[in-house]
């Protein structure tokens, strides 16, 4: 990490935690964990399998359903069902994601790009990024799907940020005035001023930057104290940052490819952490056999309820 942007590791105020196994062999490329308080279940995607998976609070009673194509991210809808970020584009479904309806323009299969991480803002909009399968520079974008209104009963996705490379985590401050965003290739978290009335993101600037030794920032979540928790692909950790970008804590994860995280459980005090075995060599997988599992810890801070798409 850049010492100009955060505390140095090992400083006395940096708290350390260790993650423990929650669900073994959850998937090849698990991402987008979300806690659904209505069902008291953890949900996550396995991107290239195209599945939306779930388990109960103890890690049991696992379920899986397929969208029939790669699924980068999702969000629950206010009235039930899901908004899906598929390889071909955005879609809406009921509880069964195999029966989805496209929203806006769709890409043909096979596509040179696919959808990646996504999340909802505090006002019911859904944001999702795209990336090239080969991670070509500037081959993706960040899209926004507004909630339907009387004036626009059938909104379509709109481009928010063009020319991204690996569009990843996005989250918002509690008051909705700031949006945090990760393009992993940039090795930093950026912050924007956010207009809740329009969904506009303006005045992009670095929030915290990282060194190659840290790995790549991937997914993120924002806790009830407005601290960011950032997963590090290749970094074997989730790191917590204060609202002014100082390192406040590190969760050590026993596998290298940490993809995302979310808070859940009855009190929103469990931090659930997804990981991947995607593109590991046989030797690497032998060294880290729990890759692709979901981990958890109870760090003390708590999260906020999942934000739902209002459409």
Where would I find each of the regions flagged by the language model?
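Blade-level signature of beta-propeller repeat domains, shared across WD40, Kelch, NHL, RCC1
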Residues: 264-311
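A short beta-strand motif characteristic of beta-propeller blades
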Residues: 18-23, 60-66, 100-108, 155-162, ...
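Conserved beta-strand positions in repeat-built beta-propeller and related beta-rich domains
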Residues: 37, 42-48, 82-88, 126-136, ...
């Amino acid at each position: 990490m850049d010492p100009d942007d955060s505390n140095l590791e090992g400083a006395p105020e940096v708290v350390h935690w260790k993650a423990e196994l929650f669900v073994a062999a959850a998937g090849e490329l698990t991402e987008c964990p979300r806690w659904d308080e209505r069902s008291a279940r953890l949900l996550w995607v396995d991107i290239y399998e195209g599945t939306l998976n779930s388990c109960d609070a103890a890690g049991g009673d696992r379920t899986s359903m397929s969208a029939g194509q790669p699924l980068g991210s999702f969000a629950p809808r206010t009235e039930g069902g899901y908004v899906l970020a598929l390889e071909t584009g955005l879609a809406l479904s009921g509880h069964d994601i195999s029966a989805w309806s496209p929203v806006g323009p769709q890409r043909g299969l096979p596509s040179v790009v696919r959808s990646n991480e996504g999340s909802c803002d505090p006002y019911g909009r859904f944001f999702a990024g795209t990336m090239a399968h080969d991670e070509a520079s500037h081959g993706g974008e960040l899209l926004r799907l507004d909630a339907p209104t009387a004036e626009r009963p059938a909104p379509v996705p709109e481009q928010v940020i063009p020319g991204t490379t690996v569009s990843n985590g996005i989250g918002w401050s509690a008051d909705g005035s700031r949006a945090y965003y990760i393009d992993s290739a940039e090795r930093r978290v950026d912050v924007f001023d956010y207009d809740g009335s329009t969904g506009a993101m303006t005045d992009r600037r670095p929030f915290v930057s990282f060194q190659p030794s840290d790995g790549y920032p991937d997914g993120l979540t924002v806790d009830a104290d407005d601290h960011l928790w950032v997963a590090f692909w290749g970094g074997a950790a989730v790191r917590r940052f204060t609202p002014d970008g100082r390192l406040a804590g590190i969760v050590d994860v026993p596998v290298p490819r940490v993809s995302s995280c979310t808070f859940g459980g009855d009190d929103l005090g469990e931090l659930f952490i997804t990981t991947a075995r995607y593109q590991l060599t046989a030797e690497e997988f032998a060294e880290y056999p729990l890759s692709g599992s979901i981990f958890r810890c109870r760090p003390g801070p708590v999260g906020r309820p999942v934000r739902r798409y209002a459409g």
